[in-house]
Amino acid sequence: MGAASRGARYLRWAIVAAGLAAMVWGVRQTGMRPPGPENGPRPSSPPAAFGPTVPAPSQPAATPPVGMVWVPGGEFSMGCADPRGIPFGGNDPMPDARPIHRVRVAGFWMDATEVTNDQFAAFVAATGYVTVAERPPRPEDFPGAPAENLVAGSIVFTPPAEPVPLRDPTGMAHLRWWAYVPGACWRRPTGPDSDLQGLGDAPVVHVAFEDAAAYARWAGKRLPTEAEWEFAARGGLSGAVYPWGDAFRPGGRWMANIWQGRFPGENTAVDGFVGAAPVGRFPPNGYGLHDMAGNVWEWCADWYRPDTYLGDAGPDGRAVAVDPRGPADSFDPQEPGQPKRVQRGGSFLCSDQYCSRYIVGTRGKGEVASSTNHIGFRCVQTP
């Protein structure tokens, strides 16, 4: 474990000891604090317009792997225009999703749904794997922390009983709806008194980045790059706002599992789900992929930097990035010492009131050792 990661984890556990774990976790995560003017790069010129998505003339060479669909690859415009002002676009300008730039990816197989509890349980049964949330922290990794406070657990959404001002100028509103719960993990998603009964087809949650990567290796797969994920999420559409098109609710139908009601205390669940939905309950996109918006965040392989797209676009903004794998390291100016990977798709907690990252071109980020009850993943496979 590197010094930066070790220090970050010690700080998290030290604050757990003080009963304020959500403070550390919350500011590490996308959508958990109000946007600010320094949240990302400032392109020197207006973002390019979306160009057409041009699928590659590729066909899968074999029978589809179980539970996977073919994503043909091709060239597309990656990124997101400032969503403020569009219906349900939210209040965040999303500067790290610009400039919009051209990207080309090769074809690949992708899980049609997020990895489920049943699938993850099969992995654990076969390997004996223990997730980050289930591991008691080692004293040598957290010098000075009282032994009684080195307790395994994870972060759980806990709606407050009273309204919360989402635009709190202190940036600490999120402390009101996240709680560190000892014993919470993928097997016990809301704490030690919970279990997975009836949740076998729900997406596995409370998985840190290394947990997702370990499952992918066992399954003979890998985590998608950010470019692969966005190409797949767009489903062949060119510059659409959502994986299914530009209308938020076409024909009045809910197309994704996101928050309804006043966030974070009132969840009207008019889409039928209070938390994560069983996978595949909402319509697929053009490539046959379900839940590419909402439900649970999905880990990608790339390190996170807010200026990644500036490099991919080239000096004149006209470059075509071919199968980009992301930057060599992580840097988030909000938290320079925290190593973060990209997360995509948003979750059941996303709302235009606070986190509109169900918009297909927007980006998320997560500290690599963090796990919560709204973070999961899906895998890809190179043919």
Predicted regions and their residues:
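Short, compositionally biased
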Residues: 2-193, 210, 342-343, 367, ...
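Functional-site microenvironments in short loops/helix caps that host divalent-cation chemistry
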Residues: 41, 70-71, 77, 81-83, ...
